[in-house]
Regions:
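Short acidic alpha-helix that forms the nucleotide-activated donor recognition element
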Residues: 84-95, 118
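Donor nucleotide-sugar binding/catalytic pocket of nucleotide-sugar-dependent glycosyltransferases
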Residues: 1-11
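Acidic donor-binding loop of glycosyltransferase active sites
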Residues: 92-107
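Nucleotide-activated donor-binding/catalytic signature segment of Leloir-type glycosyltransferases, i.e.
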Residues: 53-89
């Protein structure tokens, strides 16, 4: 068994949260910068061209001045306050791409990646360290781009990000169904099944 957090969900692409004329990238959650620092990704994003793309960062940050300095210099970056879980899930469902700022602690797996994957959306994840804990899950996920910040290949990472966003990869229904098999050990029902088995023995 593994973290029982993968729950496939229904996707709603009609958004009351974002401008539907733009490609919307979303990070949602807390940002304790001593654990996950968004600066590298923000620098990459600012190198993308075009006004048809937006980066939405929703949630609290221990270094708000860092976020606002980027949003002031690049008007495509939007900073929002924390929202409740129901609203967060609706925003995830409405976004085009989901952003994960990886942890610099090998023992802390960001639980949000399972919610991200459960919607079958393309995910862009930044790994500040080689053994960033979410990478082992995202490497199996067919719509993921893992940016290896620790290698500091800025030019290559900009190009990878640009190509990934321009391709806008999507899962068809059969591919989405395969995620149930791929991440079965991360589903609550697998966890419950084992508990029932142990109780009934």
């Amino acid at each position: 068994l593994d973290l029982p957090l993968f729950i496939p969900r229904i996707v709603n692409n009609d958004s009351n949260f974002f401008n539907n004329d733009k490609i919307n990238l979303l990070y949602i959650g807390t940002i304790p910068v001593h654990i996950r620092n968004p600066e590298y990704f923000l620098k990459l994003f600012c190198e993308l061209s075009g006004d048809d793309i937006a980066l939405n960062i929703i949630g609290s940050c221990t270094a708000p001045d860092l976020l606002y300095s980027f949003s002031e210099s690049d008007k495509r970056i939007h900073i929002g306050k924390s929202v409740n879980h129901k609203t967060a899930l609706s925003m995830i469902s409405s976004a085009d791409f989901l952003i994960n700022f990886g942890n610099n602690n090998t023992h802390m797996t960001p639980c949000k990646i399972f919610e991200y994957m459960s919607y079958g959306k393309p995910i862009i994840s930044v790994s500040p360290i080689k053994d960033e804990p979410s990478s082992r899950y995202l490497e199996k996920y067919p719509l993921s781009l893992i940016i290896k910040e620790y290698e500091n290949n800025v030019a290559d990472d900009i190009e990878k990000l640009k190509n990934f966003v321009s391709q806008a990869p999507k899962l068809d229904q059969s591919e989405f169904d395969k995620l149930n098999e791929l991440f079965y050990l991360n589903k609550p029902e697998a966890f419950i099944k084992v508990i029932k088995k142990e109780v009934l023995q």
